[in-house]
Structure formats: structure tokens, C-alpha cells
UniProtKB/Swiss-Prot annotation:
Species the sequence originates in: Xenopus laevis
One cellular component term from this protein's GO annotations in UniProt: plasma membrane
Taxonomic lineage: Eukaryota, Metazoa, Chordata, Craniata, Vertebrata
Domain EXS, chain residue ranges per copy: 435-639
Record site feature (Important for inositol polyphosphate binding), residues: 22, 26
Protein name per Swiss-Prot or TrEMBL: Xenotropic and polytropic retrovirus receptor 1 homolog
Keyword Transmembrane in annotation: yes
Entry similarity comment: Belongs to the SYG1 (TC 2.A.94) family.
Localisation: Cell membrane
MF annotations from Gene Ontology: efflux transmembrane transporter activity; inositol hexakisphosphate binding; phosphate transmembrane transporter activity
Length: 692
């Protein structure tokens, strides 16, 4: 593998700009070689002056790159040292509290037997668990910094060697010895010391001396490109996709043969939600593949465990497996008409299997990922009671595009409860008009508003935490338009069914709020979620200054499809109002539902790209995990103090507060360090420990 490819595959994406610009140096050398005056048409002194001038410019550029790398490395090393001190203080506090609570072991054991764990014991257990996770993430950040150190040194060595080869000189090697090999980023070995200390602390203090267990916890995933999936996973993906296509064809043929002249809409509404969920999972697999290929660190953005998370192959496998179940269930439902089987049992079995797959408590079938999803769903539905993270509102946004699944679930419950004739085998294709598909009882309107309500209260919670009206209250206003839109749609539908004269008034109000909602969400998609239409876009017209995906056409096509699909409701309303054909509303909504899932699939690419670029701007490459983080009010107060012009002048007034809140930078003495002297952290001495 060429070093350019190796560098591209192994860099930390959020630090991309801080690495040596190896490709730019290569282009610089090749351009100098191509543009050099020929010795055949000019004198030797002119050629020497040309190369001397080029080398002066080349080494000046090398000095700038070296200074950039030294500065960034020193900053990240200082940050790592501060983080190490903080974690060790937290660990020491937790261990001290644990020792204090075990002063009376006999009484404690008896109390455990009677009352189980006390609140203090549960808190201590949770703190230790959080500390293990925090040290694991900190260790990952150290490995990333060590990798940064090694890649940049190798980059300088390679490019200076190439310089000497092209120019037939040894000045590149001399410059490397004189500058690179004595540079702080290369000579400073404190990163190795921090790595060793972290391994020792985790082994002795958190894993009771079991080094194998400690290193398994600290294991860092490969820093290169995504590792290939196991052969059996790839085989199963292909097998499931092949079976799905064959059975899907059989479903179409069976439906054409057995369902002619029957009212299939109850069955369609019941099975439609399952299909949309499978489509969503498959497209999410494509999202994951695209993010990995483009260098968008979705693992960090969603705060997943970098050592254990689902790849695109796993998502394809799950989607394929569920797709086969869906096809067999639908085929059995249709084919059951010819042999008098109870067709209405098939959907119950299908969704029962899906539910069991999700909540299965055994540690099988992607247990950690399923548990993460269940925990995230719980956080989404309890949004007002805790701080909202990116994964929380991302999932709530997905639910807004999957709202029809909730509506179909409501229809299914209503249909099975009130309309289904359980004694007939053809219960899902009866010709009776469905009341459950209307807004008559108001439940359907409430269900339709649930996803928008979740995002609405998330925005209010974020406003409470940050005290920033923009963007959070403005974003909440965007989701509130859905409430008006659904309300007027329900009023129009019920008044029209009862032939009330004011139905047209509600129809026009529905159209107005639908238009306002579509414009609102479209502008927010393009400007806020995707960060497009930046004034400083430069050559990336109508986009942003920096883009991740290789072709600008991707962005322009995404803008066009977002505009079209945001206003696709106009087709549905027009066709339904004109009543161009039978069941026009159901047909159009069934076509538009998968298209909305596709729109959200495209949205995901650019929403995470925008978040990734924000992380790049902050050079954030690992999760921020602390046992005792600042609460939202403290964080807001600190930000306000930092924004004040006289904040520095008046800092003496808060000296008492600072003294009580600040943390000593002296490392706490743990049992694993009992023979080591206390050492203060040195922030500005990254060049005083040369080791060449």
C-alpha cells in the first residue's frame, strides 16, 4: 500500500487538517520537476538557481507544517495529562468512598442479605462502571495521539526521502535530522508513559490485578479502514437477499391470483409498517457504509462503543432476515385464502417474532446493540426528564419519517379489537368500510402527532439546558406546525364525513399549515441540519466551505429531492380531492411512505456530515465521559461568565468559589503508584525529555 493511501486510511478524521499535508508536498515536488528548465536549452547556473529557490520554498513549507504539528501535539498532550489527573482523582475518591463504606463488613453483609444493595452501594457500583468506561475511552484517545505522532514522523521521513530522490541531493535527510528528529512531537515520550500508567491503573485498581481482563477492556479497534466482515456474515447477507427476492416474487404472483376483487387495504395497512421498518434498516446499512467510506465518524457522533458496534453488513443481515419473515408471513396470509386458514393470525405471529427479537433478554442476536436501542427509545420517550444528546434527537427525527408505522399500528390494534370477525378466515380482506382508518375518534390524530411531540419537548429541554432561544425554540416552533396541520386535517376529515358546511374552511386551513410546515422544515433541513447555503462557500456554490463527499452533484441532487419530497403531499391532496380513481388516498400514501423513508435516508448522510465537521472544528475524536460531569446549570453559568467582557477582571470576586470547585493537578497516589513520588503535571515542557 502506498503511504498516501496508508495515511488516508489511518488518520483520525476529526484531526485531518492537523496532519502533514503529504499529498500537497508530493504535488509540489512533481510540479517542480515538471516545470524545471531543461539543461539542454539553458545554462547550469539557471537550473541550480531554480532548484535552490524551490528548495527554499519547500523547506519553509516543511517548517510551517512542523510548527503546526508540534503545536497540536503539545495541546493534545496537555489535554491528555489534565484528563489523566482528573480520572485518577475521580478513581481515588471512588476507592476512598468504597473503603469507608466497608468499615463494618459484617453488618453490611447482613444488611445486603435482608435489604439487598443500598443506594450508596448502587452509586459506588455505577461510579466504578463509569470509571472503567472513562478510562477505556481515555486510553483510546492516547492511542490516537500516539498514532498521530508516528504517522507524522513517517510522513516527514517519506516526503524528505522522495525530495532527495527527485532532486538527487541529501539536503532532505539533513533537514530531517536537524529539525524533525529533534522536534517536540517526536522526541517527547510522555504519551508512552501515559499509556503505561493507564494500563497499570486499570489493571491494579479496576480489574483486581487481572492484566488480561484489563487489556481486553482497553483493546483499541483497528485504526485503519473498516475491517472486512466475517465470511459467514457476508454469506448470510447474500443468502437472505436472494431468498427475499424469490419469495417477494411469489407474493406478487399469489396476490395477483388470490386477491382480485377483494378489499386488500386492511391487510396492506397492517403489513405496510413492517415493510417500512425493513426498508429503514436496509437504508441505514447503506448510510453506515457511506459514512465509513467518506470518513464521517458516526461511531463518535452516536457515542457508540468503538470496540463493539454494528457494521453495515450486520444491518443488511438483520434487514434481510426480517424481510424474509415479512415475505413468508404475507405469502402465508394470501395463500391461506385458498385453504381456509385464519389469515389474521399471520401478522400477529410476524410482529410477535419481531418484538421478541428486540426485547430478547439473552445475550444473543446483537444483545448490546439491541439494549442500546431500547435504552435510546426510553430516553426519547422520556425526553423532558434528562439532557438530550445527538442520538436522542436523531432517533426522534427518524420517528417523524416513520410516523405512518405508528398510525398503522394504531389501525391494527383498532381493527383487531373492533372490526375483525375472528370466526372468518378472510378477515383481512372483507369489503366492509373501515372506521379505524378515519379520524372519527381522535386517537389517530394523537398518534400522528407523537413523533413531532417528542422532538418538540426535546427542543424545549435543550432550551432549558442552554438558555438559547435560537436554535432550540425556533426548532420547537417547526415541530409545533405539525400539531396545527394534523388538527385541521382531522377536523376537515370528520366534518366532511358528516357533510358539515364548514368542512371547506378546515380544508383551506389544513393546506395553509401544511405549506407553512413544509417551507419551515425545508429551510431548516438545508440551512441548519445540513449547513448548506453558506456565504463563505467559495467555489462550492450554494453549499458550504468544506464538504466531505467527493462529488458536488450529490449535494445538488439531495437539495432537489428534498424539495420535491417535502412537497409531495400536494400530489396526494390533489389526487384525493379530484378522486381520480378508487382508493386514491390509500394508493398515494402507500407510495409516498417509502419515499419519505428514502428522503430521511438521504437526510442522514448530510446531517451527520454537518455534525462530523463540527467535531472536526473542535478536534473532538473520542467521547467525553466523566463520573462527575457538570450539570446543565453549572455549564450554562460557566459559559455566561466566559462571554462577559469583564469576566477576567472580576475573577478575584469568585476566588472562594474557584478554590472549592477547582481540582489539584497533582496526581493522587493510588495503590499501584505507592512507590512512585508525587509528580506535578508539566504542560509546557514537551521538549525536555528527548529520547532519540
Amino acid at each position: 500500500m502506498k503511504f498516501t493511501e496508508h495515511l488516508s486510511a489511518h488518520i483520525t478524521p476529526e484531526w485531518r487538517k492537523q496532519y502533514i499535508q503529504y499529498e500537497a508536498f508530493k504535488e509540489m515536488l512533481y510540479a517542480a520537476q515538471d516545470q524545471a528548465p531543461s539543461i539542454e536549452v539553458t545554462d547550469e547556473d539557471t537550473v541550480k538557481r531554480y532548484y535552490a529557490k524551490f528548495e527554499e520554498k519547500f523547506f519553509q513549507t516543511c517548517e510551517k507544517e512542523l510548527a503546526k504539528i508540534n503545536t497540536f501535539y503539545s495541546e493534545k498532550l496537555a489535554e491528555a495529562q489534565r484528563r489523566s489527573a482528573t480520572l485518577q482523582n475521580e478513581l481515588q475518591s471512588s476507592l476512598d468512598a468504597q473503603r469507608e463504606s466497608s468499615v463494618v463488613p459484617g453488618l453490611r453483609q447482613r444488611r445486603k442479605a435482608v435489604f439487598a444493595l443500598t443506594h450508596e452501594e448502587r452509586v459506588q457500583h455505577r461510579n466504578i462502571k463509569d470509571l472503567k468506561l472513562a478510562f477505556s475511552e481515555f486510553y483510546l484517545s492516547l492511542i490516537l495521539l500516539q498514532n498521530y505522532q508516528n504517522l507524522n514522523f513517517t510522513g516527514f521521513r517519506k516526503i524528505l526521502k522522495k525530495h532527495d530522490k527527485i532532486l538527487e541531493t541529501s539536503r532532505g535527510a539533513d533537514w530531517r535530522v536537524a529539525h524533525v528528529e529533534v522536534a517536540p512531537f517526536y522526541t517527547c515520550k510522555k504519551i508512552n508513559q501515559l499509556i503505561s500508567e493507564t494500563e497499570t491503573v486499570v489493571t491494579n485498581e479496576l480489574e483486581s490485578g487481572d492484566r488480561q481482563k484489563a487489556m481486553k477492556r482497553l483493546r483499541v479497534p483497528p485504526l485503519g479502514a473498516a475491517q472486512p466482515a466475517p465470511a459467514w456474515t457476508t454469506f448470510r447477507v447474500g443468502l437472505y437477499c436472494g431468498i427475499f427476492m424469490v419469495v417477494n416474487l411469489a407474493v406478487v404472483m399469489a396476490g395477483y391470483h388470490f386477491l382480485q376483487g377483494k378489499n386488500v387495504w386492511p391487510m396492506v395497512r397492517i403489513y405496510r409498517g413492517g415493510f417500512l421498518l425493513i426498508e429503514f434498516l436496509f437504508l441505514l446499512g447503506i448510510n453506515t457504509y457511506g459514512w465509513r467510506q467518506a470518513g464521517v465518524n458516526h461511531v463518535l457522533i452516536f457515542e457508540l462503543n468503538p470496540r463493539n458496534n454494528l457494521s453495515h453488513q450486520h444491518l443488511f443481515e438483520i434487514a434481510g432476515f426480517l424481510g424474509i419473515l415479512w415475505c413468508f408471513s404475507l405469502f402465508s396470509c394470501i395463500f391461506g385464502l385458498s385453504i381456509n386458514l385464519q389469515m389474521h393470525l399471520n401478522p400477529l405471529i410476524l410482529y410477535g417474532i419481531m418484538l421478541v427479537f428486540l426485547v430478547n433478554p439473552t445475550k444473543t442476536f446483537y444483545y448490546k446493540s439491541r439494549f442500546w436501542l431500547l435504552k435510546l427509545l426510553f430516553r426519547v420517550f422520556t425526553a423532558p426528564f434528562h439532557k438530550v444528546g445527538f442520538a436522542d434527537f436523531w432517533l426522534a427525527d427518524q420517528l417523524n419519517s416513520l410516523a405512518i408505522i405508528l398510525m398503522d399500528l394504531e389501525f391494527m390494534i383498532c381493527f383487531y379489537s373492533f372490526e375483525l370477525n375472528w370466526g372468518k378466515s378472510e378477515g383481512l380482506v372483507e369489503s366492509a368500510k373501515s372506521v379505524c382508518n378515519s379520524y372519527s375518534y381522535g386517537v389517530r390524530a394523537v398518534v400522528q402527532c407523537i413523533p413531532a411531540w417528542l422532538r418538540f419537548i426535546q427542543c424545549l429541554r435543550r432550551y432549558r439546558d442552554t438558555k438559547r432561544a435560537f436554535p432550540h425554540l425556533v426548532n420547537a416552533g417547526k415541530y409545533s406546525t405539525t400539531f396545527f396541520m394534523v388538527t385541521f386535517a382531522a377536523l376537515y376529515s370528520t366534518h366532511k364525513e358528516r357533510n358539515h358546511s364548514d368542512a371547506q374552511v378546515f380544508f383551506y386551513l389544513w393546506i395553509v399549515f401544511y405549506f407553512i410546515s413544509s417551507c419551515y422544515t425545508l429551510i431548516w433541513d438545508l440551512k441548519m441540519d445540513w449547513g448548506l447555503f453558506d456565504r463563505n462557500a467559495g467555489e462550492n456554490t450554494f453549499l458550504r466551505e468544506e464538504i466531505v463527499y467527493p462529488q458536488k452533484a450529490y449535494y445538488y441532487c439531495a437539495i432537489i429531492q428534498d424539495v420535491i419530497l417535502r412537497f409531495a403531499w400536494t400530489i396526494q391532496i390533489s389526487v384525493t380531492s379530484l378522486n381520480l380513481f378508487t382508493d386514491a388516498g390509500d394508493v398515494i400514501s402507500t407510495v409516498l411512505a417509502p419515499l419519505e423513508v428514502f428522503r430521511r435516508f438521504v437526510w442522514n448522510f448530510f446531517r451527520l456530515e454537518n455534525e462530523h465537521l463540527n467535531n472536526c472544528g473542535e478536534f473532538r475524536a473520542v467521547r467525553d465521559i466523566s463520573v462527575a460531569p457538570l450539570n446543565a446549570d453549572d455549564q450554562t453559568m460557566l459559559e455566561q461568565m466566559m462571554d462577559q467582557d469583564d469576566g477576567v477582571k472580576n475573577r478575584v470576586k469568585s476566588r472562594i468559589w474557584k478554590r472549592s470547585q477547582s481540582m489539584s493537578l497533582r496526581r493522587p497516589r493510588l495503590s499501584s503508584q505507592s512507590k512512585m513520588k508525587d509528580a506535578k503535571i508539566l504542560i509546557d515542557d514537551t521538549d525536555d525529555e528527548a529520547n532519540t
